[in-house]
């Protein structure tokens, strides 16, 4: 089993839960690891660097695969909010290794009258090693032979978001 994948399984749910409670909001985060570092990318800044547009599925697939290659990442985690048909809100976390291992977790969260997150279920025992919550995770670690113009765009985008990517040494 990949060290970075196991590290993300062990640490990412609690780190992300703490971030949600600190900021009182569920923001999409993409985290990726090599064998020594964990990197956090908060996608909320994408409208500022992407012509007013957020990060759609196609851009997420391209950019995550670009980052995986650039950082030699061996595992990627993704967390964001989802809402069920019955309006139950939950955080969906997916972790995928370059070898295709998947781990997924759902945690219910509650908000107050101002839509600020007040609580996130701390029970991390309900996980699944089978199917990701967000199917886009299945596109991570796919080889993409980027055309020159797409690669130039991704390099430019990377230079703009690079200062915002947080780097954390893996805990021993």
Residue ranges and their predicted role:
Residues 1-58:
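N-terminal domain-onset segments
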Residues 60-172:
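Low-complexity intrinsically disordered segments
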């Amino acid at each position: 089993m990949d060290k970075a994948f196991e590290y993300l399984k062990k640490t990412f749910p609690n780190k992300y839960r703490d971030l949600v409670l600190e900021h009182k909001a569920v923001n999409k985060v993409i985290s990726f690891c090599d064998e020594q570092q964990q990197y956090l990318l908060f996608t909320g800044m994408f409208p500022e660097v992407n012509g007013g547009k957020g990060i759609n599925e196609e851009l997420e697939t391209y950019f995550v695969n670009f980052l995986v290659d650039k950082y030699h990442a061996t595992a990627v985690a993704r967390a964001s909010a989802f809402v069920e048909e019955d309006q139950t809100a939950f955080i969906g976390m997916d972790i995928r290794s370059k070898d295709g291992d998947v781990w997924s977790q759902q945690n219910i969260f509650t908000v107050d009258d101002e839509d600020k997150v007040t609580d996130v279920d701390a029970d991390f025992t309900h996980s699944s090693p089978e199917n990701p919550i967000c199917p886009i995770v299945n596109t991570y670690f796919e080889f993409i032979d980027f055309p020159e113009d797409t690669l130039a765009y991704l390099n430019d985008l990377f230079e703009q978001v690079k200062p915002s990517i947080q780097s954390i040494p893996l805990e021993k």
